[in-house]
Each structure stands twice: as structure tokens, then as C-alpha cells.
Amino acid sequence: PGYDAMFSAAAETNQAISCLVNADGLPEIDRMCSVHPNVTVVIDHLGRIGIDGVIRDSDVDMLCSLAKHEKVHVKGSAFYALGKDKPGHSDLVPLIRRVYDAYGPDRLMWASDAPPSLAVETYEDQISLIRDRISFLSEMDRDKIMRDTAARVVFFQ
């Protein structure tokens, strides 16, 4: 009942819902997006896929399947907490690629997850994965992911 009330209120007030859920919560988000197709939804932290150190294809499949809902967006953030948690986060690149292929840069956004993230890595560490180390992103893609998508979705710009 809580999700129903939240999605109904978001629909009435034209607000985006930011969902901090693990991968096992994505099916319920899918159901709610089917019931409320006009609600803008942002999945935080790549659906927390890999929070236990393992990136499961089934979890990535579920996250990518939500792209069928045109108002669903994904936030790439908390890289320090996902996957193998190694500097550079290169193990997350295949996950990011699949999500990029499903959603495109207009429905992806980056976030720092500060202040918690600053306890384990610098701000530079956080932005460098998207900004510098993912070769399949164009400069325009990076601008959208790092700035434009969030400006449009969160700040209605």
C-alpha cells in the first residue's frame, strides 16, 4: 500500500520518485510503473546490483527490462559500494554498458553519493569512471549523464 500511495501522489504532483532498492525490489518497481506509467522514476545506485560483490546477469536483465517504461531513469552512483570495490571500478563497466544500451544517455544520470562516498574515495575518483574511463561514451553522452539528464528530470530544466 505504501508504494501505491507514493506513486499516486507523484502522479498528482508531477514529482519524480527516486528509488533506493536492491535488485530484488525491481520487480515491484516494474509493477508500479505499469500501474502508473506517467510517473517519473529514478533507480538509484544502478539498482544496487553488485552490492554483495557479485554482478548477476539476472539482476542486470531485470534492471534493463525496466527500460520498457519510458519514464524510468537510472542513476549511476555509489560505485565504491558495488562490484569488487577496487579502485577505478573497471569491473562495473560491463554493467554500465548494458544499462547504457537499454536506457541511452537521456535516461542515465551520474551522482556522487556524497557524503558517504567521500569516506572511501575522493570526488575525483567518483567522477573519473564516467568522465575518463568508459570508451564507448561520446562527449555528448558524458554531458547528458553527468549533467543534462539530472537537470531535466530532477530540476525540470
Model-predicted regions and their roles:
Residues 98, 102-109, 118-157:
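Mid-to-C-terminal alpha-helical segments outside catalytic/metal-binding sites
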Residues 113:
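Active-site glycine-centered loops adjacent to acidic/histidine catalytic or metal-binding residues
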Residues 81, 116-118:
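Short, active-site-adjacent cap segments at secondary-structure transitions
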Residues 1-109:
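Catalytic pocket-lining loop regions of alpha/beta-barrel enzymes
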